[in-house]
Amino acid sequence: MTFGDWPPQRRIGLTGGIASGKSSVAALLEKRGCPVLDADVYAREALATDTSASKAVVARYGKRVQKDGTSDIDRAELAAIVFNDPNERSWLEQLVHPIVQRRFDDALRSLPDAPIVILMIPLLFEAGLEKWCSEIWVVRCTALQQRERLMARNNCTEAEATQRIAAQWPIDIKVQRADSVINNSGRIDDLHDQLDALL
């Protein structure tokens, strides 16, 4: 589907650095009546037990990426592999991204009358999906906040958090490519004000 095929609709690509607060922003937008399509949800579904993608992951990495006694993918173990090796990360992205894109396509086709749809895509720029969006919003916070939030959320070390942040494009590059930038380093009231202005 090309942008010219779409109905008149604001398709807002919501992206930003890992642990910058994209989900918090998306939740506020959803409360304002905007449907939110989440790439992370689609990626998790793509790697659900016994899907073709999960079988390909097990075939490549073996039982070490399976939770003990189950066929489920151990996402923490898989993350440890791909964040330590750019080649493996690229392989996984090439496996999962086409599946995620098909899910987005199907979901967008089901929402022709929605005036605004939010496409929450952490790797929007990295995956070259700008063409899917009529505008792009980048969520950012301070580097210290990002690292501390990631460590708390993922229960990881500072070194692991730094590694995961470095695996994505630098936030300054994303900001340069954004139509709008949302500063999520302050109070929740400030966040509400920014969203009200953008909508």
UniProtKB/Swiss-Prot annotation:
The protein's annotated pathway: Cofactor biosynthesis; coenzyme A biosynthesis; CoA from (R)-pantothenate: step 5/5
Alphabetical keyword list: ATP-binding, Coenzyme A biosynthesis, Cytoplasm, Kinase, Nucleotide-binding, Transferase
GO molecular function annotation: ATP binding; dephospho-CoA kinase activity
Main location: cytoplasm
One Gene Ontology cellular component: cytoplasm
Residues where ATP binds: A19, S20, G21, K22, S23, S24
Pfam annotation, one family: CoaE
Domain DPCK, residue spans: 11-199
GO biological process entries: coenzyme A biosynthetic process
Catalytic activity annotation: 3'-dephospho-CoA + ATP = ADP + CoA + H(+)
InterPro entries hit by this protein: Depp_CoAkinase, P-loop_NTPase
PROSITE patterns: DPCK
E.C. numbers: 2.7.1.24
Localization per record: Cytoplasm
Protein task: Catalyzes the phosphorylation of the 3'-hydroxyl group of dephosphocoenzyme A to form coenzyme A.
Family: Belongs to the CoaE family.
Protein name: Dephospho-CoA kinase
Gene name per UniProt: coaE
